[in-house]
C-alpha cells in the first residue's frame, strides 16, 4: 500500500467517524447489562414485529415469544417503548454491518454502493402491515427518520469524497449537489417500503432500492 493510498483510506475512515449516530433507545450501559435471555426475547420480538405491532398488547407479546410479562416490563415500561427498543436495535445492527462492509481502501463510489446495499437490508423483509403500522405511529416514524438522516449524512460524506477524487460529475459541467443526491439514493429503501409503494413494485424494497442506486450512480460517474 502506498502512502497516498494509506492517506485516502484514513480520510474515508475519518469522515465516517465524523458523522454523529442517532441517540440509542437503550444507552450503552443498559445494553451491556442485558442478559442472554433478554437479548433472545428482543430478537424474537423483531421477528414478531415484521408482521406489524399495533394490535399487540404486552400480554399478547409475552405469549408469542414465550416469556413472562415481568420479562417484558424489565425491558421497557410500555408496549410502544418496547417496539422502539426492538426496532432501534435492529437498525443499529444493520448499520454496524453496513459500516463493516466497507474496506478503507475502497474508492468512495464503490464504498457508497457497498454501504447502501448493506444498509438496505433494513427494508429487506418489510411487510405492508409493518409499513402501515410504522407510518401510523409517530414515535416509530421519528425513530426511522433519525436513522434515515444518519444514512443520508454518511452517504453525503462518501459522495463528497468521490467528487473530490474525480469519481463523480462532468469536469466541464456544473458541480454535483451531493446533499440532493444523498437524500435520493439513501432514501430509496425507505421510499419503496412505504405502504403505498411496497405493494406496487414487483420486487422487494431492498431489491428495488439497490437497482436504482446503481442506475443513479452510473449516471453520475465521471466519464473516462
Regions found by a protein language model. Give the residues of each.
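N-terminal intrinsically disordered/low-complexity leader segments
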Residues: 1-39, 224
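Hydrophobic/aromatic-rich alpha-helical bundle segments in the mid-to-C-terminal region
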Residues: 3-5, 130-134, 141, 145, ...
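Short amphipathic alpha-helical elements of helix-turn-helix/winged-helix folds
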Residues: 44-48, 118, 122, 188
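Short helix-capping/turn signature of helix-turn-helix
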Residues: 51, 76, 132-140
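Hydrophobic alpha-helical connector segments
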Residues: 85, 98-125, 181-182
Amino acid at each position: 500500500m502506498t502512502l497516498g493510498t494509506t492517506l485516502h483510506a484514513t480520510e474515508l475512515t475519518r469522515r465516517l467517524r465524523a458523522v454523529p449516530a442517532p441517540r440509542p433507545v437503550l444507552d450503552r450501559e443498559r445494553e451491556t447489562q442485558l442478559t442472554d435471555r433478554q437479548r433472545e426475547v428482543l430478537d424474537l420480538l423483531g421477528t414478531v414485529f415484521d408482521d406489524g405491532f399495533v394490535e399487540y398488547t404486552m400480554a399478547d407479546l409475552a405469549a408469542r415469544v414465550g416469556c413472562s410479562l415481568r420479562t417484558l416490563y424489565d425491558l421497557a415500561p410500555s408496549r410502544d417503548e418496547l417496539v422502539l427498543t426492538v426496532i432501534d436495535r435492529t437498525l443499529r445492527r444493520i448499520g454496524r454491518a453496513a459500516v463493516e462492509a466497507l474496506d478503507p481502501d475502497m474508492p468512495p463510489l464503490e464504498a457508497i454502493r457497498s454501504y447502501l446495499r448493506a444498509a438496505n437490508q433494513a427494508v429487506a423483509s418489510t411487510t405492508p402491515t409493518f409499513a402501515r403500522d410504522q407510518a401510523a405511529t409517530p414515535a416509530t416514524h421519528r425513530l426511522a427518520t433519525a436513522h434515515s438522516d444518519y444514512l443520508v449524512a454518511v452517504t453525503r460524506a462518501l459522495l463528497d469524497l468521490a467528487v473530490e477524487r474525480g469519481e463523480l460529475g462532468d469536469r466541464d459541467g456544473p458541480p454535483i449537489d451531493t446533499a440532493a443526491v444523498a437524500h435520493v439514493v439513501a432514501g430509496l429503501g425507505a421510499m419503496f417500503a412505504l405502504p403505498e409503494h411496497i405493494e406496487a413494485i414487483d420486487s422487494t424494497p431492498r431489491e428495488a432500492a439497490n437497482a436504482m442506486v446503481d442506475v443513479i450512480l452510473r449516471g453520475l460517474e465521471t466519464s473516462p
